[in-house]
Amino acid sequence: MFYGHHHSYSEKPDADKEAIDDLTRQAKDQTGVMATLTRARVEQLKAEIQAERAFSKGLDRSQKQILKTINAALEISSPSALLNLSPPEFSSLLLNGGLGEAIDGYIDQQNRIMKSIDKVMNATAPEFSMNSIEAQSAAIQTQNVSAIFDDLIVPEISAAVKAGLTDIMLFVPVEVAMSNMATKMKSSRGGQLNAIKTKISQYGRSLTAVAAEAADLDNYLFTGPRDGITRKFCRALVDLVVDEKQMSKLDNGQGLSVKTSCGGYNCRHSWSPVSEGFIRAANLQKAKPKNIAKANAGAR
């Protein structure tokens, strides 16, 4: 989703709670369509945070299962034979050995996020249905799974397993090699989960962007926490509406798309597609050139 706090995964989870509490307070102070939208955003943020935490637990279980799988494989095969497996065969070993379960669990979390986005769209465009972008949603879901597992998780786990198998082949005791394997997997977790947190947020934002295009909405309300730990880029935009032309001029300074990454890595703010009717009903303010310039000046 598109929220704008910017903490690393290793920081205390209170940062997520602060973002939820901030938005919840906003919803209580609001009325009508704006309150409905903010409540929907709270649900989406909760769904994304739940996805992050469930992913962490699922990956932990999968890595432990992979270690058991490799241990069992070594009882009937040699480390050199396992190292000689083709890339597809080696990936299959990891998937069937525990990683597949983590993928299935993440897809379940993706579906929860999609349902929360449906509520967001219902708040701003009641006539729109996510069913109308089923094909695009499936493509985004597949791409997101690939970006997380194929690009981040599988290479790290493969490297750790192959390093351990090489150690065993060089006569390092199996117990020592397996322990080193587990340590290597664990050491990569921090960076992985931080990147994954951003990928999960980008998934929700990408779905919303496609939904907005399908619903012919080209105005976006920037919503999210208003507290003091919010990026200057985000603080300059909170509660303002930008159009597509203004969106293209925004630069978060991190080389990431503003539409799908907002303020950048780990951002907890969001873009909500809104119609002209919604803008009038909620008495929203449209961003001016000075607001865009101020946001860009605060980017980092």
Placement of each model-derived feature along the sequence:
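N-terminal leader/targeting and assembly helices and adjacent pre-domain segments
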Residues: 1-193, 199, 203, 274-300
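Acidic, glycine-rich two-metal-ion catalytic cores of nucleic acid-processing enzymes
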Residues: 185-287
